[in-house]
Amino acid sequence: MNLFGRGENLPEETIAVIGLGRFGSAVAESLTRLGHEVLAIDERPEIVQRASETLTHVVQADSTESAVLVQLGIGEFDHVVVAIGTDIEASVLTVLACEEAGVREIWAKAINAKHGQILHRTGAHHVVYPEWAMGERVAHLVSGRMLDFIEFDDGFAIVKTKAPTEAIGKTLGESRLRSKYGVTVVGVKQPGEDFTYATPDTVVSEGDTLIVSGATTKVEAFASTT
């Protein structure tokens, strides 16, 4: 049973979300708002009933059984998000069942590094740590002068921060922030205006907000000067 068979009027990609806790529900609802066709799966009847109020395709099923997933046509989905977190056994068995069903790309939520390692070894192509990522983000916002912070797996980060005093009234080329701090200013926003892409000729004014990218340690050091 495949709810999203290929056809001229159907989406090019299909996505299934397994586990409809807070994280899974947020992922499924966000994907739906973005215009994607989403199949949501959970084994708890009360959760399925509640999710049916906001999602079009919701199925009650035991995702740890590969035969059940095969019946749902899970192997024909382009992406499957395993959003089961606290029940580690169910999380691992679901990833294994997805792998056995031939899912091409498996995203899985992990609650810690050891859980993530097991998921990778079981067949997950991508592992995310939403609680850790949010904790890291909030820690940077609370302890530093950043307005926003996003870190990637490879030690690369993007931050939103106020313009440092040394750059005000100068072009980015004149202030030489890149050579001094090893970061790249990719966008500048004046109060009340939209962000614009930064160039060496962009003039930084007092009150401007900068979008800066670079190695995590370098953008942290740069943000501390603002």
Task: Identify the meaning behind each predicted range.
Residues M1-T226:
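Cytosolic regulatory regions of ion transport systems
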